[in-house]
Amino acid sequence: MPSTPRRRLIQHPASSIQYLTLSLLTLLTLCATSPAQPTNLTSAFDLPPGFHIYRAATAELSGGSYDLCFDGEGRLLVGDGTAVRRLIDRDNDGIYDGYEVIATGLGPRGPQGLLVWGDRLYAVGGDGLQLFEGYRSGALVHRGRLGAKFNTGGDHDLHTVLRGHDGYLYLMAGNGAGIEGRRHITEATSPCLFEREASVFRVSPDGQKWECIARGGRNPPNLGMNYLGELFSWDSDMEWHVGLPWYRPTRLNHWVIGGDQGWHDVGALPPYYLDTVPPVLETGRASPNWGVFYEHTQLPGKYRDAFLVCDYR
């Protein structure tokens, strides 16, 4: 059996972006103290001093983990390809040993976005952004799709959904999600009059109001909002262009309201164009995946308010 490659957690000296590279869709928990359980995976990773990593759930429990989130009670939800599972830790030892399926009909390869907000569960799957109600009571009811249809399940389709500080939903759509014209926009106040390529949408909780607040990305599977309400993502490159003069590396995007990231189908505008938002940081060859802002206190201070992202390679 081949040896497990070592992976790295690196802080770039010029930014607050860290890379947690994961070669398998295994659900892992990262902490700054020694794990209490024996399934210790620290030796398979290159980690900063004082960090340890252990397996919180096996692949059989997580079901592949296309996305994950915590609810208001700290319970972990994962997408297993077609459904939402809520993992169970029966003996409270920090290791999950069971699960229950709480929502279905979210395939293929989904849900790729999950959010619990009060009594509602939002999930990216099927034909777009789905709404379930009754989460607190344990009797979830599917209320249907919010807004117009999206493509889901593919690597370039509809991705992350998160709750904004302003009480709205924010949705990241990849360049293959079915973005065109004003297909999903309902409001005349939309900062971008037309959606184009990978776009970020601002959506009312009931799904009645849709705005495109930024556009023109390649395919960022992730979206994070910092404590100031600013949106960032780690965007993909075009692998066909590697070695060519116009190759654009993976990059950290700042989704400025009304801004355009400059990607056009199979090419990109130069970053010095007045109507193109330049990257915060170019990050070379990679395969961007999940990302989140770290807003807690368990990790050392220098990691707080940092954007943690996963490299699928």
Positions of the model-derived regions?
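Intrinsically disordered, low-complexity proline-rich regions
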Residues: P13-A14, L20
